[in-house]
Swiss-Prot record:
It is a multi-pass membrane protein. The chain crosses the membrane at residues 15-35, 48-68, 80-102, 120-140, 167-187, 201-221, 237-257. Its main location: host cell. GO terms for cellular component: host cell plasma membrane; membrane. This is G-protein coupled receptor homolog U51. The gene is U51. It comes from Human herpesvirus 7 (strain JI). Belongs to the G-protein coupled receptor 1 family. Residues 1-14, 69-79, 141-166, 222-236 are extracellular. It is found in: Host cell membrane. Residues 36-47, 103-119, 188-200, 258-294 are cytoplasmic.
Amino acid sequence: MKNIDLTNWKLLAEIYEYLFFFSFFFLCLLVIIVVKFNNSTVGREYTFSTFSGMLVYILLLPVKMGMLTKMWDVSTDYCIILMFLSDFSFIFSSWALTLLALERINNFSFSEIKVNETKILKQMSFPIIWVTSIFQAVQISMKYKKSQMNLEDDYCLLAIERSAEEAWILLMYTVVIPTFIVFFYVLNKRFLFLERDLNSIVTHLSLFLFFGALCFFPASVLNEFNCNRLFYGLHELLIVCLELKIFYVPTMTYIISCENYRLAAKAFFCKCFKPCFLMPSLRKLQQPTKSTQF
């Protein structure tokens, strides 16, 4: 809490503005690619649940920006609601992404096992992730409220500051626990996979764990240090690092939801930019030869 007076809130609000525009455009791009160019229907409901949760989180960024610039002066209760919605939307997206990964893993298994487990998963999944996400978001929001009970002024600024201090909780809830659930699920079914499928799953798990740790771990470890004495602007950078989830969660959702994410992206860009940019080899093929000119 010693770093609060040193935080450049206007700079942080400006960074939030850029994050909002880039992340909103990026999310819309991924949704278009998934809807138009992804032939796989496995786990589509989980895919769009993850995208919906991240969309809510992104749309809350301008609200945070308005509070950081003192454009809106809201009460303590409204600030708690804002922090709850922000945490809930992200936690819900993380659990929906976990269920998407589990269903995609079932798709690699034998048909009988796949059908039975997919039905059970769909029947139980959404009530479980709703209850789990609400419980975890309320728990974190109560920590915000308890730590700021005697600090009524600039409450939302302090709540956003507290979000960096509670980063290790979000790291456990949204990265470590889901990753280990999927890992043990794969470990239990490893004999059902081809080697290339198993390698692909392990690679995706490693990427998700790496980007999640990159997002939350620095803020949780360096929280007790006076970061601005170490490096000016490091404190704001750590808070901004927490927002990297608006990029890596949709990206992992897109990669996991597609049968071939490279093919889907290639089809999208070819359709959009083919009239303007053609490969030299394609141009040569389209040019008439000497024998056909006459």
